[in-house]
């Protein structure tokens, strides 16, 4: 075997070994990264909701119906269990699902339909002041109070001096 062929073969073996080591290093790094990130994703299962987050979520889920912090008696499948558990016990101290949140929504009131835009404009418009009819005097409370106090009228109250 010639020395040139030996060095060429040796360098090929070294190169292959180096590539394998680099490949192993990359693979090991990738595996370590995945393992480092995996526990965070496994632990991040269902969340707990407390305080303002719980209220905001209930408002979103229940909408215009409103919600209760404790279930009304006889409401929902857990009415047979103890009645002292509320939404905080069920969703703040442990995780809860959407179904559990919906159990705390107030029931839909029958016959209550959203107002139409036309009705809203009509009922929400500012009231105009009524004009007194001819021959009637329209005095404000301030004017009446000033008249009564100038006459010495105390409104039925007796004052001693």
Swiss-Prot record:
Keywords: Disulfide bond, Growth factor, Secreted, Signal. Residues 111-161 are annotated as: Disordered. GO terms for biological process: cell population proliferation; insulin-like growth factor receptor signaling pathway; negative regulation of apoptotic process; positive regulation of cell population proliferation; positive regulation of phosphatidylinositol 3-kinase/protein kinase B signal transduction. Residues 74-85 are annotated as: C. The keyword Transmembrane does not apply. GO terms for molecular function: growth factor activity; hormone activity; insulin-like growth factor receptor binding. Residues 45-73 are annotated as: B. Residues 107-114 are annotated as: D. Disulfide bonds join 50-92, 62-105, 91-96. Residues 115-161 form a propeptide. Residues 86-106 are annotated as: A. SUPFAM superfamilies: Insulin-like (SSF56994). It is found in: Secreted. The keyword Disulfide bond applies. One of its GO terms (cellular component) is extracellular space. The insulin-like growth factors, isolated from plasma, are structurally and functionally related to insulin but have a much higher growth-promoting activity. Acts as a ligand for IGF1R. Binds to the alpha subunit of IGF1R, leading to the activation of the intrinsic tyrosine kinase activity which autophosphorylates tyrosine residues in the beta subunit thus initiatiating a cascade of down-stream signaling events leading to activation of the PI3K-AKT/PKB and the Ras-MAPK pathways. Binds to integrins. PANTHER family: INSULIN-LIKE GROWTH FACTOR 1 (PTHR46845:SF3), INSULIN-LIKE GROWTH FACTOR I (PTHR46845). Belongs to the insulin family. This is Insulin-like growth factor 1, juvenile form. It comes from Cyprinus carpio (Common carp).
């Amino acid at each position: 075997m010639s020395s040139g062929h030996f060095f060429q073969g040796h360098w090929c073996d070294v190169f292959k070994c180096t590539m394998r080591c680099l490949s192993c290093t990359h693979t090991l790094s990738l595996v370590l990264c995945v393992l480092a990130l995996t526990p965070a994703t496994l632990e991040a299962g269902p969340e707990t909701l407390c305080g303002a987050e719980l209220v905001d979520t209930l408002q979103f889920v229940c909408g215009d119906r409103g919600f209760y912090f404790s279930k009304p008696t006889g409401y929902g499948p857990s009415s047979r269990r103890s009645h002292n558990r509320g939404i905080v016990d069920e969703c703040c101290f442990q995780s809860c699902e959407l179904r559990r949140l919906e159990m705390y929504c107030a029931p839909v009131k029958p016959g209550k339909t959203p107002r139409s835009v036309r009705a809203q404009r009509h009922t929400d418009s500012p009231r105009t002041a009524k004009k007194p009819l001819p021959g009637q005097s329209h005095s404000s409370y301030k004017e009446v109070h000033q008249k009564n106090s100038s006459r010495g009228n105390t409104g039925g109250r007796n004052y001693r001096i």
